[in-house]
């Protein structure tokens, strides 16, 4: 039997891009291609790129260059594939003219066509080697579930719609089938992602779909309830990311707080507020009522006291005054957000914010970002310290002789904190990766927790 053709794969960018990579790799394996872990062991290389900010663009271009140097046969996909250069031609083709093919994001079919053109598929594909859940690039016990592609918003700092297009929601039955297959494969935590999770179904007018004979609207609240019911059957978690602060978010909070889904639909919201001053938010083309946001955050916590809120912000946006920045700091103190990230504003090629007046010097932008993070870390440290002495449910991510590393319901992988768990002293308390364990919290710093089983 002849050796199967081998494809190398480099995946860059956000969790949405990671899901695209998983779909491409799943299709490659379904058609009988092997995935090579090295450049020299591959017949060609696929590079999935990111093009959101300048640093990501450069990282992607460097990765393409490295793949060309080490292998020579490279197909490029992802957000950077849709980006144009100053001359109007494709940026990748201009910088790296030797690439075999370039596609935009979420383009499994186009990538496979390019692979077929340069590396014909085997005659006897090993379809049985591909699990129903597909090939995943995350650890076995958690996975990302992408429910839609694209975005209908036109935030002035963002170019995602120009690369990924307008919102396209996946059929609800398709999403539920993937979720079920993932749970059956041993996944203990599903991280629901998209460009705008709250907008799920807007493009199809919340059309009713069917799953196992039951009607489910193509709508965030209905989908979350269905996922929560499914997760409860498998003793698993569902975590929501990229939740735009629409009024409909209020409907999801009770699912986290009470009833059959409590403990399965996690009391966790990733809501990118971006700023708090109405004038800055208007220039960003974001919802501009910060006082109402504060009221909603307080109401959410009244309904669900255990709620963790993660958010991201931009400091030093064009035209931001010192007073407007102080308003942002006041918001962080009052809202008491649990997990916060902040970026010093950086111009992104193609973003309409580049045309706004009042661009701030680099040192001012960075100084404001640093001040923001000082305040945010003080708030986070206070909230985390309240967990000392409590017993929390922890999902174990890593195990070594020194103990385990896991996460609570308040911590998403890669971006939030962790719990350092003491080694189990009794056989009855031993744990492995993917286990849920009860941990008594004995210590905390500004970001992480320590505890014992």
UniProtKB/Swiss-Prot annotation:
Keyword hit for S-adenosyl-L-methionine: yes
Name of a matching Pfam family: UPF0004
Subcellular location: Cytoplasm
Domain of life of the native organism: Bacteria
Gene Ontology molecular functions: 4 iron, 4 sulfur cluster binding; aspartic acid methylthiotransferase activity; metal ion binding; protein methylthiotransferase activity
Cell cycle in keyword set: no
Protein name: Ribosomal protein uS12 methylthiotransferase RimO
UniProt lineage: Bacteria, Pseudomonadati, Pseudomonadota, Betaproteobacteria, Burkholderiales
Gene name for this UniProt entry: rimO
């Amino acid at each position: 039997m002849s050796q199967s053709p081998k494809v190398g794969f480099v995946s860059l960018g956000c969790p949405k891009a990671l899901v695209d990579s998983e779909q491409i790799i799943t299709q490659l394996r379904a058609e009988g291609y092997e995935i090579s872990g090295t450049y020299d062991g591959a017949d060609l290389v696929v590079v999935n790129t990111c093009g959101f900010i300048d640093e990501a663009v450069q990282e992607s271009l460097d990765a393409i260059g490295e793949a060309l140097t080490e292998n020579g046969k490279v197909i490029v996909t992802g957000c950077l594939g849709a980006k144009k250069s100053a001359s109007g031609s494709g940026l990748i083709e201009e910088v790296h003219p030797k690439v075999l093919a370039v596609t935009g994001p979420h383009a499994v079919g186009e990538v496979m066509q390019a692979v077929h053109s340069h590396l014909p598929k085997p005659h006897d594909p090993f379809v049985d080697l591909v699990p129903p859940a597909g090939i995943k690039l995350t650890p076995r016990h958690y996975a990302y579930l992408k429910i839609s592609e694209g975005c209908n918003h036109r935030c002035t700092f963002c170019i995602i719609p120009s690369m990924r297009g307008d919102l396209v929601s996946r059929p609800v039955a398709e999403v539920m089938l993937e979720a079920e297959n993932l749970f059956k494969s041993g996944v203990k935590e599903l991280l629901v992602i998209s460009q705008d999770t709250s907008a799920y179904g807007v493009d199809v007018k919340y059309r009713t779909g069917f799953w196992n004979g039951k009607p489910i609207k193509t709508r965030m609240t209905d989908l979350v309830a269905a996922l929560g019911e499914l997760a409860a059957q498998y003793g698993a978690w569902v975590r929501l990311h990229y939740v735009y602060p629409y009024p409909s978010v209020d409907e999801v909070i009770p699912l986290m707080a009470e009833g059959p889904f409590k403990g399965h639909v996690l009391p966790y919201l990733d809501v990118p507020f971006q700023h708090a001053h109405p004038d800055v938010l208007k220039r960003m083309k974001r919802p501009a009522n910060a006082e109402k946001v504060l009221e909603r955050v307080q109401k959410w916590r009244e309904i669900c006291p255990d709620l963790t809120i993660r958010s991201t912000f931009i400091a030093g946006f064009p035209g931001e005054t010192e007073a407007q920045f102080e308003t942002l700091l006041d918001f962080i103190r009052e809202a008491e957000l649990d997990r916060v990230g902040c970026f010093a504003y950086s111009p992104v090629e193609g973003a309409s914010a580049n045309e706004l007046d009042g661009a701030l010097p680099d040192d001012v932008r960075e100084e404001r970002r640093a001040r923001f993070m000082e305040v945010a870390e003080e708030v986070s440290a206070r909230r985390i310290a309240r967990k000392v002495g409590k017993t929390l449910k922890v999902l174990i991510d890593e195990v070594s002789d020194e103990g385990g590393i896991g996460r609570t319901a308040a911590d998403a992988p890669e971006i939030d904190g962790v719990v350092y768990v003491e080694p189990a002293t009794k056989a009855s308390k031993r744990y492995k990766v993917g286990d849920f364990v009860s941990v008594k919290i004995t210590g905390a710093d500004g970001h992480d927790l320590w505890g014992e089983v």
